[in-house]
Amino acid sequence: MIRYFTAGESHGPALSAIVEGMPAGITITPKEINTQLARRQQGHGRGGRMKIESDKAEILSGVRFGKTIGSPITLVINNRDWQNWTTTMAQFEKPDEQCSKITIPRPGHADLAGRIKYGFDDIRPVIERSSARETAARVAAGTVARLFLKALGIEIGSYISAIGSAAEASPDKQLEGLLLEGAEAVARQADLSPVRMLGKETETNALAAIDGASERGDTLGGIIEIFITGVPPGFGSYVQHDRRLDAALAAAIISIQAIKGVEIGTAFENARKPGSEVHDEFHLSREKGVIRKTNRAGGLEGSMSSGQTIHLRAAMKPISSLVTPLLSFDVETLQATPSRFERSDTCAVPAAGVVAEAVLAPVIANALLEKLGGDHLDEIRQRLDLYRESIRSTFHS
């Protein structure tokens, strides 16, 4: 089983991740991880932090001669901004007079509940760990799993379909063509846009919406479309709740900071229709075997992969730190006061798409290993090839 843990504070010395359970024999370089980290930093509407950081990952263990060796992989990303926070985030020295406590929670953030939960008299520790800066470590960890999947013909990609009220209808023909190449083709096309959108008109509207929100001291959320191609049918299980692939994928998406909703396929549209207009019918093809002409289920049926493209949609709320503050209160004086501003983005939806790709990779990798087993890439590839061939021979005349 692949699992990973992250550590580090937003303005601490570094972020780190330990990835355990990765099979041996996977080719990996810092360059591939750094490419994904750079993608995470892109997007119109990002804040001043992105001008400071230039995220690079260092691999400290689990790799020899450019290949994984089956032992835990340690990844470290240094925080360049740490040099400006050595007093506020000192690990051992006592705070001086300049290190004032934060006692005003921001609506929509972890501030108040985190302070209550851990008994802090200062909200700063809550801000530091709940920050979406942590997702840099998750992108690094997820990239390792992505490289494993890519070596087996499984790809993950995303694009942004809405930012604020700037939304585009599904670009069906363009999307269909890209997905035939693999999900990464969707991501490559999206990355050409500063808001990771596929339609030019919607991109223009989104850019204007972000600029308008920035001028007003406001923030914007949006909708992320994520695709996974190359997954054969039968990954996951209906037998127990904790083996359901749809549940694991949804949990991974909803674990991303500021993500408040997840949809599989066209689930919410399906809920308004009769079953005769929803379920993806089977068709038999002499050349292709069993095919579907629709994919409203999003590539998941009975909590297992169906063999179609897996499609998830994530809803990201507007970021909680606003230049124009909402109403809050001081937890020490219990006096009403405007909320405080913590340096943040106007819109981070494009970056969240990259994070979504990363967090789904370990989920698919675990479903694959649960089905096939194996400790070395060559062993697993051989088993997957046999599994795919058994499916092909069963349904082809």
Swiss-Prot record:
Key words of the record: Amino-acid biosynthesis, Aromatic amino acid biosynthesis, FAD, Flavoprotein, FMN, Lyase, NADP
Keyword Coiled coil attached: no
Enzyme Commission number(s): 4.2.3.5
Binding-site residues for NADP(+), renumbered to this chain: R40, R46
One annotated Gene Ontology cellular component of this protein: cytosol
GO biological-process terms attached to the record: amino acid biosynthetic process; aromatic amino acid family biosynthetic process; chorismate biosynthetic process
Domain of life the protein comes from: Bacteria
Cited Gene3D superfamilies: Chorismate synthase AroC
Pfam family, one: Chorismate_synt
UniProt binding sites for FMN: R129, S130, S131, Q257, A258, G302, K317, P318, I319, S320, S321, R343
Entry annotated with the keyword Transferase: no
Molecular function (Gene Ontology), one example: FMN binding
Catalytic activity: 5-O-(1-carboxyvinyl)-3-phosphoshikimate = chorismate + phosphate
HAMAP family: Chorismate_synth (MF_00300)
Family affiliation: Belongs to the chorismate synthase family.
Record's protein name: Chorismate synthase
Source organism (scientific name): Pelodictyon phaeoclathratiforme (strain DSM 5477 / BU-1)
